[in-house]
Amino acid sequence: MCTKTIPVLWGCFLLWNLYVSSSQTIYPGIKARITQRALDYGVQAGMKMIEQMLKEKKLPDLSGSESLEFLKVDYVNYNFSNIKISAFSFPNTSLAFVPGVGIKALTNHGTANISTDWGFESPLFQDTGGADLFLSGVYFTGIIILTRNDFGHPTLKLQDCYAQLSHAHVSFSGELSVLYNSFAEPMEKPILKNLNEMLCPIIASEVKALNANLSTLEVLTKIDNYTLLDYSLISSPEITENYLDLNLKGVFYPLENLTDPPFSPVPFVLPERSNSMLYIGIAEYFFKSASFAHFTAGVFNVTLSTEEISNHFVQNSQGLGNVLSRIAEIYILSQPFMVRIMATEPPIINLQPGNFTLDIPASIMMLTQPKNSTVETIVSMDFVASTSVGLVILGQRLVCSLSLNRFRLALPESNRSNIEVLRFENILSSILHFGVLPLANAKLQQGFPLSNPHKFLFVNSDIEVLEGFLLISTDLKYETSSKQQPSFHVWEGLNLISRQWRGKSAP
């Protein structure tokens, strides 16, 4: 009996483990894919970054002692200080993905020119001066391992580092340079040996410094006065032969409450493409969490006075006076009134191929306040406003705009043939279209920040709506100097996408 029970218990244990692990699976709200094209461009940009870094970087001092037998000198103590790389060339450099591991860097046939100060001391003499060091046959290979820390920051680790310099030539300058250059060759070998021993530790030190910078990245970004956006990594990068995927949490929180929304992200798969350097998939979950967080914060509640409505009806061909007179005709009003609109549920997000819609369930109240009296409700009813979401990439942000597709009061079908109901529905639709949506679009102008590498700009960007997620395809451009970012407070010249869902980034 006992022998039969043990396999059953083990089976139950394994099933329980599978259930627990599957129930704890976390899917990303944002998925970023780096392709081989990005790595190839990264080699070019990397050279610019290294050049900029080397202008400010001072290498460790190099010192030692050598005997010069041909001069009958027992020892010469030497010290090279203030070592700076003045020029370099790495013509054969490549980056490649190592599936499941990281990114392999390889360079060979490199050269470098180094300037340095030196000092010599021996039983016969001591002196100081300057020197130039030419290095050739530079070879380096190593693998950068990418993981994440407990706070969702990316971390880097150098593995299998191998670096070698094949040749070194020293040229001394100064009054006795002819003398020193005559015995420079015997010193080149120990210099080469010391440099070869220093290279991998120097590179590892730079990776460590880069990790320190990565650990300070803000994975929680304040979007507005109501919400935060979590950009943290939820898992280590997924690496294949052709690309690297970063899974980011991509969820909005109310400013005062970092609790996950009452719904979970669903998995989505980026299409197998390689024409762009970077692909960013933004899941429906990302937008749903933004909707929920703003709803929780009360952002979707608005009250408009007669004067405020007037300011937004200037584009209405019928004119505000005509609309207000129709309302007054129905309710026999002589005093100013207010319109209060409140979302009754978080707006509903729906992403289908070529179509991004936002349905807003809400209630609308017409209010008035006679002199020396409290606010009175004239009428209150529920409605659903269906809107299309227009998209554009402006700078490094995804900017949205809303346009009204349909406005429908929540009434029994039997009442829809009532002429007065239809008139009122049209009036409220006009108020929403010309009064409320312009206010919403003004707030949406600040956009959502898109995560991108430091000093890299998005260029040749394209937006596509697929089932369940938004796909951004873009190339990258490295900016050596910081330029002022475009303003997000002006809409003139923007080609906002309404029906054509594939678009280029704004110029």
From Swiss-Prot:
**Disulfide bridge map:** 161-200
> Which residues carry attached sugars according to the database record?
79, 92, 113, 213, 225, 257, 301, 355, 372, 415
- Identify the tissues in which this protein is expressed: Detected in the basal layer of the epidermis from inflammatory skin from psoriasis patients, but not in normal skin.
Which stretch is the leader sequence?
Answer: 1-23
The cellular location(s) given in this protein's UniProt record come to: Secreted
Keywords, ordered alphabetically:
Disulfide bond, Glycoprotein, Immunity, Innate immunity, Secreted, Signal
| Top-level taxonomic group | Eukaryota
Protein name per its UniProtKB record: BPI fold-containing family C protein
Native source species? Homo sapiens
Q: Give the taxonomic lineage as stored in the record.
A: Eukaryota, Metazoa, Chordata, Craniata, Vertebrata
